[in-house]
Regions:
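Short acidic, glycine-rich surface-loop motifs adjacent to enzyme active sites
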Residues: 84, 177-201
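Short, intrinsically disordered N-terminal pre-domain segments
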Residues: 1-18, 301
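Active-site neighborhood of phospho(di)ester-bond hydrolases with catalytic His/Asp-centered motifs
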Residues: 51-53, 80-86, 110-117, 153, ...
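Solvent-exposed loop/turn segments at secondary-structure junctions
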Residues: 55-58, 87-90, 117-121, 156-160, ...
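Alpha/beta-hydrolase fold active-site loops
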Residues: 47, 79, 140, 147-148, ...
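N-terminal active-site segment of His-dependent metallophosphoesterases
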Residues: 15, 22-97
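A short C-terminal boundary segment appended to hydrolase-like catalytic domains
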Residues: 42-43, 281-342
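Extended active-site neighborhood of metal-dependent phosphoesterases/phosphodiesterases
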Residues: 93-178, 205-211, 216, 220-227, ...
Length: 342
């Protein structure tokens, strides 16, 4: 990693005073001021939460990876942890029951999870009741923490992700909370196939999400995020490691499409491609495990990307995101597709 790999939102840890300079042999040769990487004067932290994704229970070391992450997050005193889908690899009863048993046995703080595309593979027609049974929450729901609202959206398939009812509910929830900070958790990033976007560095991952009639839903979903300026969108799906930012500025965080978008790698099998836009074959690191601890302040959040195996926070995945509230006038959202009843 070099200094040029950072983006404008990257910040040093709150406690950092200087940047160490090392030569190619790993020997420290000096230090420089933090400069633009200085942590802002943000005041006191309000609370923290965990943000992980793509557990894929039944694959490789997924169980031990999941337990390790839960144990660490509990020890770091997060208020709760959000899981951004793909709790299991196939979504069958055995895997979902195992997910529930691991959460029950290891999570000492609340877990708020949503369904990803892999969770729909067995019970597509009945996915809402299956997820409610094993994850202990409705298919889509809200959680409040102080003045903040967490909007949790499950998906029912890889094409059209939502029912009409869920998409309408999403609009109504954003409208009702338009002048509050809203953290939106939904599994799929906002790009179909190999469209380059946050979470799909250089378009190197092929995603089936948003295909077919899902294309219209994608238009609506993006327009909702862009209109309701106080929202921050968290997603997983591609598994791509944090280090891909070295090859693509928008790999992990982006706001160039009019909304704040945050990519969460896989907690159990992150992908470690070299960043080439032609590298679309999976290169899973089954020994790896990455995710976020998110520190919340009055006017911003500190995203702290972590390697759960090495036990380190990663400089390339440390971001300050300004969330100063903006006024959104009531009844001003317009849907060009006619999907949403306003």
């Amino acid at each position: 990693m070099t200094y040029s790999d950072f983006i404008a939102e990257n910040v040093a840890p709150k406690e950092a005073k200087r940047i160490g300079v090392y030569n190619s042999k790993g020997n420290r040769v000096g230090q420089i001021p933090l400069g633009s990487l200085s942590f802002p004067n943000a005041g006191q932290k309000l609370y923290s939460f965990g943000a992980i994704s793509d557990v894929h229970l039944s694959v490789a070391d997924s169980e031990s990876d999941f337990i390790r992450a839960l144990n660490y997050l509990d020890s770091s005193k997060v208020a709760f942890t959000c899981i951004c889908g793909d709790l299991t690899n196939s979504g069958n009863d055995t895997q979902l029951a195992r997910y529930k048993s691991l959460v029950d046995a290891n999570a000492k703080t609340p877990i708020y999870a949503v369904a990803g595309n892999h969770d729909t593979y067995t019970y597509n027609d009945d996915i809402e009741s299956q997820i409610s049974t094993y994850a202990g929450k409705p298919f889509y729901y809200t959680v409040t923490q102080g003045n903040d609202v967490f909007i949790m959206l499950g998906i029912k398939s890889e094409g059209a992700l939502f029912t009409a009812t869920e998409l309408q509910w999403f609009y109504e929830t954003l409208e009702a909370n338009r002048n509050k900070r809203c953290f939106v958790f939904q599994h799929c990033f906002t790009g179909y196939a190999t469209t380059p976007t946050c979470g799909n560095a250089n378009g190197m991952y092929y995603s089936y999400c948003w295909s077919g009639e899902g294309q219209t839903q994608l238009t609506v979903f993006k327009s909702l995020l862009a209109h309701y300026k106080n929202s921050v969108f968290f997603h997983g799906h591609s598994h791509l490691k944090f280090r891909l930012q070295a090859a693509c500025d928008y790999a992990n965080f982006d706001d160039s499409e009019g909304y704040k978008s945050v990519h969460i790698p896989s907690i159990s099998r992150p992908r470690q491609e070299d960043g080439s836009d032609s590298d679309t074959s999976p290169d899973y690191d089954d020994a790896g495990s990455e995710g976020f601890v998110v520190d919340v302040y009055a006017n911003g959040i500190h995203l702290r990307g972590r390697d759960f195996v090495k036990g380190d926070f990663l400089p390339i995945a440390s971001y300050w995101v300004d969330t100063t509230l903006q006024t959104v006038a009531a009844g001003t959202y317009k849907d060009s597709t006619g999907t949403i009843t306003v």
